[in-house]
Amino acid sequence: MLSWTVILTGIFMAYAVGSLAGGHFLSKILYNADVRQVGSGNAGTMNVLRNLGIAAGIMTFIWDTAKGFLVVTLGLKGGGAELGVLMALAAVAGHNWPLYWRFQGGKGLATSLGVALAVYPAAVPPGAALMGLLTFLTRNTDLATLLTFSALPIYFWWREGPGCYLAFGLGLAAIMLLRHGPLVISLFYNLKERR
């Protein structure tokens, strides 16, 4: 049984590491710019790709995926699946809402990929396939993301694994609902206004 000190330290560390947005650092280092001041205003891979180029986008994707994978792997080795799951959710939350930059972060896709590869890699191929299909059908990555992550709890329930994996799916779905839900609602509202 892990102590509360270990659990809270792990969560804080994961949030802090998750908050280190690759897009922010790379835009400063390579271009002396703040990616949050251009395009969509977030520090994630897609905004970097669209506004700073393919190379910067790829480096941002690798950075954000790696930070999620590494911090959760550390948690899994040090405290087992339960601590790993808590740290995974904290890392994604840190990426989406970093304290360092007034909670203006990315959308969490690359970091979610990293934590999923650490916690339950078998979920990644079907998740990526579903995400690709939904993006093709809806032509909207926010809606596709929301639908894909909403399916995660169902996947883990179907797999009948330990309860912490179901909690992982529910937690990621909730985080993505908070991050992408308002964007999807805004999209539908704008479409309705145009009619």
From Swiss-Prot:
Recorded metabolic or biological pathway in which this protein acts: Lipid metabolism; phospholipid metabolism
Subcellular location: Cell membrane
GO process annotations (BP): phospholipid biosynthetic process
Membrane-topology descriptor: Multi-pass membrane protein
SMART domains per UniProt: G3P_acyltransf (SM01207)
Pfam families linked to this entry: G3P_acyltransf
Family recorded in the similarity comment: Belongs to the PlsY family.
Assembly information from the UniProt record: Probably interacts with PlsX.
Name of the protein this chain belongs to: Glycerol-3-phosphate acyltransferase 1
Record lineage: Bacteria, Bacillati, Bacillota, Clostridia, Moorellales
